[in-house]
Amino acid sequence: MEPDIKISAIFPVSAKKLYDSWLNSKSHSDFTGSKAHIESRNGSHFSAWNGYITGTNLILQPYGRIVQNWRTTEFPEGAPDSKLEVLFEKHNGGTKLTIIHTHLPNGDEKKYEKGWKEFYFKPMKLYFQKSKPASKAK
């Protein structure tokens, strides 16, 4: 089955930093600009964007992969959770982060793809660019 959404972006930080930031309430809140509560524990519940997003951590493979049940307050009543897979891959001194999002409500794929780009990738690029160590002068 093809994923509903599969998008990637490159960040100028290690997979460890990106992974740890995704699973830390303060960092997740800081890089999205909105309140999040998340733990790096299998089976733990999380919320992001002031409760708009909720779910459960299903699989946590340190610095490589996160799998979550994921939903928003806009999912139709009775709709099952979607599945989110976040992959972290070393890439030219940084990390390629890939979002694979499946089982979204029919017709909502473009809306959520736009959301990932605007409300995650865009602010994350700014956040991690600021946290990148300055280059040393020669």
Across the structure, where does each feature detected by a protein language model lie?
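Hydrophobic-ligand binding "helix-grip"
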Residues: 29, 36-37, 47, 51-96, ...
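A conserved amphipathic terminal alpha-helix motif
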Residues: 103-138
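Hydrophobic ligand-binding cavity/cleft-lining segments
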Residues: 1-37
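Charge-dense, helix-prone N-terminal extensions
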Residues: 2-4, 9-10, 16, 43-44, ...
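Conserved short-loop catalytic and cofactor-binding motifs
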Residues: 6, 34, 45, 100, ...
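Alpha-helical scaffold segments that form or flank carboxylate-/histidine-based iron centers
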Residues: 13-14, 45-49, 111
